[in-house]
Curated annotation (Swiss-Prot):
Record family assignment: Belongs to the type II topoisomerase family.
Single GO molecular function: identical protein binding
Assembly, per entry: Homodimer.
Protein name per its UniProtKB record: DNA topoisomerase 2
Names of the cofactor(s): Mg(2+); Mn(2+); Ca(2+)
Lineage: Eukaryota, Fungi, Dikarya, Ascomycota, Saccharomycotina
Keywords: ATP-binding, DNA-binding, Isomerase, Magnesium, Metal-binding, Nucleotide-binding, Nucleus, Phosphoprotein, Topoisomerase
Amino acid sequence: MSTEPVSASDKYQKISQLEHILKRPDTYIGSVETQEQLQWIYDEETDCMIEKNVTIVPGLFKIFDEILVNAADNKVRDPSMKRIDVNIHAEEHTIEVKNDGKGIPIEIHNKENIYIPEMIFGHLLTSSNYDDDEKKVTGGRNGYGAKLCNIFSTEFILETADLNVGQKYVQKWENNMSICHPPKITSYKKGPSYTKVTFKPDLTRFGMKELDNDILGVMRRRVYDINGSVRDINVYLNGKSLKIRNFKNYVELYLKSLEKKRQLDNGEDGAAKSDIPTILYERINNRWEVAFAVSDISFQQISFVNSIATTMGGTHVNYITDQIVKKISEILKKKKKKSVKSFQIKNNMFIFINCLIENPAFTSQTKEQLTTRVKDFGSRCEIPLEYINKIMKTDLATRMFEIADANEENALKKSDGTRKSRITNYPKLEDANKAGTKEGYKCTLVLTEGDSALSLAVAGLAVVGRDYYGCYPLRGKMLNVREASADQILKNAEIQAIKKIMGLQHRKKYEDTKSLRYGHLMIMTDQDHDGSHIKGLIINFLESSFPGLLDIQGFLLEFITPIIKVSITKPTKNTIAFYNMPDYEKWREEESHKFTWKQKYYKGLGTSLAQEVREYFSNLDRHLKIFHSLQGNDKDYIDLAFSKKKADDRKEWLRQYEPGTVLDPTLKEIPISDFINKELILFSLADNIRSIPNVLDGFKPGQRKVLYGCFKKNLKSELKVAQLAPYVSECTAYHHGEQSLAQTIIGLAQNFVGSNNIYLLLPNGAFGTRATGGKDAAAARYIYTELNKLTRKIFHPADDPLYKYIQEDEKTVEPEWYLPILPMILVNGAEGIGTGWSTYIPPFNPLEIIKNIRHLMNDEELEQMHPWFRGWTGTIEEIEPLRYRMYGRIEQIGDNVLEITELPARTWTSTIKEYLLLGLSGNDKIKPWIKDMEEQHDDNIKFIITLSPEEMAKTRKIGFYERFKLISPISLMNMVAFDPHGKIKKYNSVNEILSEFYYVRLEYYQKRKDHMSERLQWEVEKYSFQVKFIKMIIEKELTVTNKPRNAIIQELENLGFPRFNKEGKPYYGSPNDEIAEQINDVKGATSDEEDEESSHEDTENVINGPEELYGTYEYLLGMRIWSLTKERYQKLLKQKQEKETELENLLKLSAKDIWNTDLKAFEVGYQEFLQRDAEARGGNVPNKGSKTKGKGKRKLVDDEDYDPSKKNKKSTARKGKKIKLEDKNFERILLEQKLVTKSKAPTKIKKEKTPSVSETKTEEEENAPSSTSSSSIFDIKKEDKDEGELSKISNKFKKISTIFDKMGSTSATSKENTPEQDDVATKKNQTTAKKTAVKPKLAKKPVRKQQKVVELSGESDLEILDSYTDREDSNKDEDDAIPQRSRRQRSSRAASVPKKSYVETLELSDDSFIEDDEEENQGSDVSFNEED
């Protein structure tokens, strides 16, 4: 059958727009076919929204929605509109929508020549929204709206009344708007204006016969939507008020549904209170309302744009949702260390949005999805952080944590280990041969602290074998996994290595170790606090990641090594190992005096020798400890130690610690709770000790070490910081980097405003400025420092012997704390952050502190002290107790010009400058508000700021101080410090700190007085017995010649002479024979009476012995021959009387008197300090004055006592290098050995070049031994090795009487002949030396010959006797009066002699022999070569 071809005219048609809408309705109103959708509908029975599957025709719902939106838009045009009535007559298939308010104008359109109501509702593409220049927030947009409802209705009636014009307009359309009846206009004099639309949908076009329940439910929900999204209206549905006043009420309809759904999901009749879902509502501004709830399924949203229900969301939903997701993600990452993907957060959100958008654009006429760009919204909606924090308190946070944990668990399981026989990924692993095999559970993995410990552990494997032992080194400390993220754990190499090597599987519940490569884990760390911390971190890792593993007895082990070894040399050689410091301290106090011994501190495993490690592994019973399986509340203690959530509990845990509590080293099995409470706690305490100062001196350990080092070095002349730091490190056994010490030194010397009120060190160089708070200090190698003169007035030297000094690394280091004369913690303030504790104490005025100290002395009421900063010119206001506010200084110097001349203390210049520059230039968030800014600083602050008149007015309104950030708070509510007993204490007031300091300081002033009086009493006793000894010698009651040493000592004991120890303390009585022999061997033996090994090694390295307690007779037997003269006898009597008078005067003083004396001296020095500081900051650097060389220790006079501290010192050859003896000097200061009374140095004699330099000598003279040089100082090698033989000693002593007789009989002759001899010597010298004028007065000084002989001698009686006997034997005449030196000594001296003259000023003390260029650095003023 053939068909006729269709013509082109028939194929292409043109239809009217009305026909197009009816033929293609989906373009305008959506589908006209029945569809099943998941929709929220209003359920009348439960009075809430419920989500259910419904069968509706979207097009029918859309034409209903268009009429509702028209009614809602009228609220924007007429804010006085208050009511919308919706009546749905399902049986009649009729719907009515009526709104009050301003109606449609009832007039004929000028251009179209028809009534405006007819044009709007009966003609397509007519609207009042076509002016795009006018920003509108209505729903109508394209000119279709109500016309679409008219087109798809069989009957459409418009009714509008305008009371203002007194008319009512009614018009009817039928048959899909194809029939338009003429309008009926009547008079309207009563009632409000209104607009009403009544229509009957053309159900046949929608494939429907009636309005069923599904479509009615959706329509009713849409009426509720209008009521919730349009503000300040009443909506009635079928004559019933909906009673929804705002968007929040509307959102709550969904809350009931969520609650009911959760009940159904949980199978409960009623949900627990904690499970009730919450909806968080927030009205951001007049155009944005947001509500949030947790979604139980996936992301859900209910949103409205200008009352239009955007069921498909759009840019406005993304705008809000993205903000919430981003901020929640940031919180999870920063605060909770959790990582969750954005879609996982979004899928758990239910968002409600009601907004007004200017000229909104949608994807289609159905308006289900907004497409307007965010920048075109016409308003912004920034979700506040407070709202996000509220969201984080809902179930969303819990779900995110669960999701994150699940993500982490999956990620961590990917890195699980397995039991395999060989692992090749870790080159440093020393794998056990049996690891990963069926015998793997018998193997032990040794985890060592670092590579150095690994080598030692490997050495130990030589003892136990490598079949069942493996080793692996840890790099530093492990990660605290308790709050760590999965990403942190996965990136931690140590944790991943342990899992692989051990074969551990994350979160696996272990009941035995047969599935592991190793069945035991042994920790081998240093025996210090850091080693304990590593053990704790491993325990924390195992407990939190592998449940059940620590329940297996014997799984976790530790290998302990000694922390100190004591080597006993006498009476018998022995070695004692100590595994903790308290045990060592106990032995030192109770047992050490019985032995001669030395100690060795084992800082780490690297200190041990390989042989020692093999010995340790050979005795595993002693060195291997087992951690007991978890019991009781062990898990709680692990959580307490490592959980960040337990910070407050940890603070109390630390506060309750009793000093001296340690883990019992004899325990074979260590309970984990004991380990945490008795060993691990020491690490946390050490952290606090490093960070929080002591209330007595205000120092942290590093600062205390620096001050100790400066005192020990007597740092009176400047020294590079880069040189001082290593010196402090060495002399205080500092175990950390020198760089941190250098920074501490810089901090103690900083003098800019806001730093130290009293800087204890002088800043000779760029030590930082106020610009950056000291961060701009120069490098340590460029700057110098020295002790401030005021420092020793604050830390009085007389207190040094009273402190308890710490013993570390075989040496005495800094004290536990210093006791300044006023509380430096208040003078300079303090701040720091430790474990569980932090502190902030501002500085105060030293003079106010002293005033209150005197109030305490007088039992008077204390005055209130306020924070004070040296050199600061701002003001401080007390706003409430313990709270202050600091203000800078700002003044108006012109109409719109301001001058800032001071900042709040510790607000640095750079901070304010950055703020002002931001105000000058602005950025994306801040507009420029400063017109101009100048800086005119010198040492003081000066900003000149120019504002515009508008900004000046605004600044006045805000406040000058507020706008320029010239206000800073100070709080006294966190004043934490260690109390005198070593416990952390929080102080409630400044006066409480002062009172705590006062009573301890007063007690120590009494101790100082007692100590000084005791030392004076000892000196009186020593002088008394020296007088008695000399008298007995002179009167022949005591003979010491030609007697064995032990016999002399025994006779002295029988005569009641006490021994005096190094400290100057007398010991009466006789120690037992064994101890006496040790004393004599160590302190009194000559070189040939001891075996070579003992004399070379034992006496040199022994640091403790019985002689410390019992002392020796060196104060008698070490006196010079000159001491046996009558003059010396009388002088000793006079010295004894002087000491008795000094003691009597001291006893008259009270502790408060001594303290007041110190305070007065400080006040004088402090005023000088303030003057110098003000001059320095003002640019006038005070003159330090010239330093005088040669001033310092005087020479010993002929008849002064022997100094026992020098006799047994090892002789030191001067090989062109400087000799440093500051350690020994400091020990003398500490012990206050006042054996030599200091006086001014003798007048120096300027001569021609002396014979010792330029005179030609015979070979015999050059080879002859010097009769006056000290063998302990100048000799390169020992001469007269047989000098100590008893026979030779006897021969020397035989000549004592003869020498005494000669000295007595020739004394007058010597006085007469000495000048002549000097003249002869001078004339003789003139034959070989260039003439130089010599002052007659100095040249003729009497007894110069004898003085010179003694000056060059530092020898004992025996050495002087040796000189005299040599002279007697050689029968030398005049030349014997000239001191002779060896060739090396003479050449050494000659090298440093100036060409024009030679001045000789010799010091008998061996620690005075220091070259000139060393003097300033060593704090010694002794000079040998100086021109007058």
